[in-house]
């Protein structure tokens, strides 16, 4: 029996969309985006985060001022209940996807060996 991996991937996509983790993430995301003040705060946090990630990927130095700005932004969004809940839901979704990736990569790790072991 031949398995169509793309069909399996689309099934996994649908399962992810129907999961409790995704539902909670989407609801919290919609709530944050429905509140103009929270949306502005969250967008600012994301912009700072993406800017720092881009600099790291480009091998650029991150200034102390940028580090302090990022720390202030994190402290600010963590004080906002809905944004804090959204960030927790994002973390749970990220861990779920990492677990799924481990499962998907298992045949290749078995074939080639796991370099981390």
Swiss-Prot record:
Pfam families: Com_YlbF (PF06133). Belongs to the UPF0342 family. This is UPF0342 protein BLi01058/BL02870.
């Amino acid at each position: 029996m031949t398995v169509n991996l793309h069909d399996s991937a689309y099934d996994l996509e649908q399962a992810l969309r129907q999961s409790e983790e995704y539902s909670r993430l989407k609801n919290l995301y919609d709530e944050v985006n429905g509140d103009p003040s929270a949306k502005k705060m969250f967008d600012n946090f994301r912009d700072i985060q993406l800017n720092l990630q881009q600099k790291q990927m480009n091998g650029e130095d991150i200034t102390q001022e940028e580090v302090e700005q990022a720390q202030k932004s994190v402290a600010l969004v963590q004080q906002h209940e809905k944004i804090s809940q959204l960030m927790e839901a994002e973390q749970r979704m990220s861990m779920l996807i990492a677990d799924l990736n481990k499962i998907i990569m298992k045949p290749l790790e078995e074939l080639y060996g796991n370099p981390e072991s």
